[in-house]
Structure formats: structure tokens, C-alpha cells
């Protein structure tokens, strides 16, 4: 291996393809030498316990909770009624906890949240993903459009009831100010409480940041996938949220209308690009880890992603430098023995093999380019370079017997493979490491979080 490395360095000096882009340091991965992780966040406990169907998640390098449950030590997701007294209106029109944040006690909410966190995550050394899924309203007034406009209307009425002497213009301005102040307090203080109680967890809000690039249904061939500038500006205004987050959880769910299309890649790419931008501006010492939420099946269906769309979601997420991807799923996955078998078949076929492909390729790239002290990131984010095992050099083999199933990757990198990686990828060093290949250790670069 040493002589190949020397040849590789010589070839690279000749190529001189590094484009000089500065990459902010990253937080070290959750698990040592695992630069890209795949999580399972679907309620499939019944597949194992009731139907005796093992989805083989660990076989295919997928991190999951005990018994493949929705929440546990690997990843815990908090829905609206699971954490504190979150004020909102649900999808059926039911009112909860004062409806708007300025009409509910923050102290009451935090006290209840503390109890909920202790109950749902009893382990104080929790080291997994802590995801708060609050989607009913957004903390910025101008983003509460469509069905969320009710929160603006309720806020205006709330201000009017308290200050009937004010003009309508002043009432509206006051309503916006009070709403945004209360919304910020609810989201920020909840996050800080969770981080104080379980400081080793990776905490953030699901779907933050968003890109609002959903116009593929109307633009057709004219669709670019780019985040509107106004939405990027609004994301900039949420710096208070990014600074207090310890992870970001955008989503890259694909609707079936995007199946195997150029628009699917545009959609995913720009959502990830925005998340990586926010990750780099949130802190001064390191970029926040990004874990993109995806679905193994097209949204609102039980149709598995095509091979092309696995590349679009999993492959794109890894190549852009995210820390991992989280597969979310519905109760439909475990509703019957047939549905469990369908998930298992997909896992043992294209899905599982592709996950092994990407996670292994990411580890190899980290080892040969970054000395295991960083992860590989595309040099040019808009390129079509992916972290894939080279088919001429590697094989993925699945072995199974009556007691176990395991996946083995066989092969070795050739010189041309190394050159390809160096031409197309660069290192994002973990905290404490620097240099083109993350070869220099510097304790002063590690700051206390």
C-alpha cells in the first residue's frame, strides 16, 4: 500500500488540481472512523417482535434503535405532543396549549419538557440524534403562509384583545413582534434545555434549514432547484437557532413525480447545499454536522426508490459532506407481515447494497485522502462526483447461513482510483486536525463546545 501511496502523491503533485477552497473544520463523527452514517428512524418494531421479520439493518451498516423502534439510544424524535406543552393546531383542527406561543407559559412548557426528556431519554449519556419535529408553525412571521396563516390571524386577534385602543396598523406590528419573540423563546429555550440535560446528543429541529424549492410541479423543465434568495435571507435571520443547534436536519424526501428525473437531483442538491451553507455559518470553531432526512420509499407511497434515486438521495448527501442520512418511515412499513417482507426484500436488494457501497467508499476516501482525520467532500459542490466503490476494483458479497447474515466488501484501490478521488474530493478535517490531508494535529484548534 505504501508504494501506491507514494505513486499517488507524485501523480497528484503533477495534476495540481486542488482548487484552494477553504473548508471549515467538522465535528468528529459520532462513531470513530465512520465519516458517513445511515440511520433508521421508522416504527418497525412490529416486524421483528410480532411478525418475526428481521430487516437486517445492522447487516447493511445501518444504525438503529433497539428492536428497530422509532425512538431510542441511536435516534429519538419528539413530535408535538411528546415534548412540553407545544402550542399549535393539529391537522384535524384541534387546539392545543393556547394555540400560539405568546398565549402559553414558557415556564410550564420547560418544566414539562424536562420531565418528558427524562422519561423518553433516561440515559444521561445519550449520544444519539435528538430531533424535535415541530412543523405546525414557523418562528418567522413571514413564513407562516398558507394553512399556517392562522397563527398570524390568531396573533393579531390576541394583540387586539389586549390592546383595543391601538390602531390596526400598530396591532399588526405588535402581533408580529410578540409572536416572533415568543416563538424564538419556545424553540431556543427548548433546544438549550435538551442540550443541558443530554449534552452528548446531536440536537436540532427537523426540516431546519428549509430551502422552499418545491416549485418542480409547476416549473417542469424550467426548474432549477435553487433556493429562492428570499428564503436564504430568511435562513440567515435564524442565526440564533443555528448557533444553539448541535446538528441540522433538512429533508430530501422525493415525491413520485420526481422519480428518476433530473429535477430530483436538482431538488436534493440545492437543499443540501443550503444546509451545508448554514452549517458553516452557525459557529466559528466547526461546521455543524448535517443529517439529512430521507425516505426509502417515495413520499406518500410504498414504492421503493429507484437505483438512480438512491444515488440522488444517499449518494448526493454523502458527496456533499453531510455527516449522515436518516431514513424515516411510517407505520405502514410494519402494518402487516407482507409490508415487513417488502421492506426486508428492498433492504436485502438495492437499498442495503447501495448503503454498504457509499458508507464503505466514504471510509476508504477518509482513510487514503484524510488519514482518517477528516471526511471527503466534493471539491466542486455542483459536480457529479460521488463516493462510490469502484466496480472494477471492489465487490460486495452477502453471506448468510441459519444463524447470521453478513456483508463483506472485497477489493483494493488502484492508482487510478486514488487519482480520481484526489481530483474530485478534498478533506474536511475534524476538529484538532488541519492541512491538505488533515495530517497536522493542533490541540489549540479544539475549542470547548
UniProtKB/Swiss-Prot annotation:
Subunit structure, interactors included: Monomer.
Q: Where in the cell is it found?
A: Secreted
- Residues modified by carbohydrate are 67, 103, 111, 153, 357, 401
* Catalytic residues as annotated in Swiss-Prot or TrEMBL: 135 (proton donor)
Q: Per its record, how is this protein called by name?
A: Hyaluronidase-4
The record's SUPFAM superfamilies line, in alphabetical order, gives: (Trans)glycosidases
* Entry GO CC: cytoplasmic vesicle; extracellular region
Molecular function terms from GO: hyalurononglucosaminidase activity
Q: Give the InterPro entries listed for this entry.
A: Aldolase_TIM (IPR013785), Glycoside_hydrolase_SF (IPR017853), Hyaluronidase (IPR018155)
Annotated GO biological processes are: carbohydrate metabolic process; hyaluronan catabolic process
Signal peptide residues are 1-23
State which Enzyme Commission number(s) the record gives.
Answer: 3.2.1.35
As its record notes, the protein acts as a catalyst of:
Random hydrolysis of (1->4)-linkages between N-acetyl-beta-D-glucosamine and D-glucuronate residues in hyaluronate
Q: Which superkingdom heads the taxonomic lineage of this protein's source?
A: Eukaryota
Q: List the disulfide bonds.
A: 47-340, 211-227, 365-376, 370-427, 429-438
**Mind telling me which PROSITE patterns this protein's record contains?**
EGF_1 (PS00022), EGF_2 (PS01186)
Instruction: Write the record's keywords in alphabetical order, separated by commas.
Output: Disulfide bond, EGF-like domain, Glycoprotein, Glycosidase, Hydrolase, Secreted, Signal
Function, as annotated: Snake venom endo-hyaluronidase that degrades hyaluronan to smaller oligosaccharide fragments. In venom, it is not toxic by itself, but increases the diffusion of other venom proteins by degrading the extracellular matrix. In addition, it displays antiedematogenic activity.
Q: In which tissues is it expressed?
A: Expressed by the venom gland.
Domain EGF-like: residue ranges: 427-438
Amino acid at each position: 500500500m505504501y508504494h501506491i501511496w507514494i505513486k499517488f502523491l507524485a501523480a497528484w503533485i503533477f495534476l495540481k488540481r486542488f482548487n484552494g477552497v477553504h473548508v471549515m473544520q467538522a465535528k468528529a463523527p459520532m462513531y470513530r472512523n465512520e465519516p458517513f452514517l445511515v440511520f433508521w428512524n421508522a416504527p418497525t418494531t412490529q416486524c421483528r417482535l410480532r411478525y418475526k421479520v428481521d430487516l437486517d439493518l445492522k447487516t447493511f451498516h445501518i444504525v438503529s434503535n433497539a428492536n428497530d423502534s422509532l425512538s431510542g439510544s441511536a435516534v429519538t424524535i419528539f413530535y408535538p405532543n411528546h415534548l412540553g406543552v407545544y402550542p399549535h393546531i393539529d391537522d384535524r383542527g384541534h387546539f392545543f396549549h393556547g394555540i400560539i406561543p405568546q398565549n402559553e407559559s414558557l415556564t410550564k412548557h420547560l418544566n414539562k419538557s424536562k420531565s418528558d426528556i427524562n422519561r423518553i431519554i433516561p440515559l444521561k449519556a445519550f449520544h444519539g440524534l435528538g430531533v424535535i419535529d415541530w412543523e405546525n408553525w414557523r418562528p418567522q412571521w413571514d413564513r407562516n403562509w398558507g394553512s399556517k396563516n392562522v397563527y398570524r390571524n390568531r396573533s393579531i386577534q390576541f394583540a387586539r384583545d389586549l390592546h383595543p385602543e391601538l390602531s390596526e396598523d400598530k396591532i399588526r406590528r405588535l402581533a408580529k413582534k410578540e409572536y416572533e419573540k415568543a416563538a424564538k423563546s419556545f424553540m431556543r429555550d427548548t433546544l438549550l434545555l435538551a442540550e443541558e440535560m443530554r449534552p452528548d446528543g446531536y440536537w436540532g429541529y427537523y426540516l431546519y434549514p428549509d430551502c422552499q424549492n418545491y416549485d418542480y410541479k409547476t416549473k417542469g423543465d424550467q426548474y432549477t432547484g435553487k433556493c429562492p434568495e428570499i428564503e436564504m435571507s430568511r435562513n440567515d435571520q435564524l442565526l440564533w437557532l443555528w448557533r444553539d443547534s448541535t446538528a441540522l436536519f433538512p429533508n430530501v424526501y422525493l415525491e413520485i413525480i420526481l422519480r428518476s428525473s433530473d429535477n430530483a437531483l436538482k431538488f436534493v442538491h440545492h437543499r443540501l447545499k443550503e444546509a451545508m451553507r448554514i452549517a458553516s455559518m452557525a459557529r466559528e470553531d466547526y461546521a455543524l454536522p448535517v443529517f439529512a432526512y430521507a425516505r426509502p420509499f417515495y413520499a406518500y407511497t410504498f414504492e421503493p426508490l429507484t437505483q438512480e434515486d438512491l444515488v440522488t438521495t444517499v449518494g448526493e448527501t454523502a458527496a456533499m459532506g453531510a455527516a449522515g442520512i436518516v431514513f424515516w418511515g411510517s407505520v405502514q412499513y410494519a402494518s402487516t407481515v407482507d409490508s415487513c417482507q417488502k421492506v426486508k426484500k428492498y433492504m436485502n436488494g438495492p437499498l442495503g447494497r447501495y448503503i454498504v457501497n457509499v458508507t464503505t467508499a466514504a471510509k476508504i476516501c477518509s482513510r487514503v485522502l484524510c488519514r482518517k482525520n477528516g471526511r471527503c467532500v466534493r471539491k466542486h459542490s455542483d459536480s457529479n462526483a460521488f463516493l462510490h466503490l469502484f466496480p472494477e476494483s471492489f465487490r460486495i458479497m452477502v453471506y448468510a447461513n441459519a444463524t447470521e447474515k453478513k456483508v463483506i466488501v472485497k477489493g483494493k484501490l488502484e492508482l487510478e482510483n486514488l487519482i480520481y478521488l484526489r481530483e474530485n474530493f478534498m478533506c474536511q478535517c475534524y476538529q484538532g486536525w488541519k492541512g491538505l490531508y488533515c495530517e497536522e494535529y493542533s490541540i489549540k484548534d479544539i475549542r470547548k463546545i
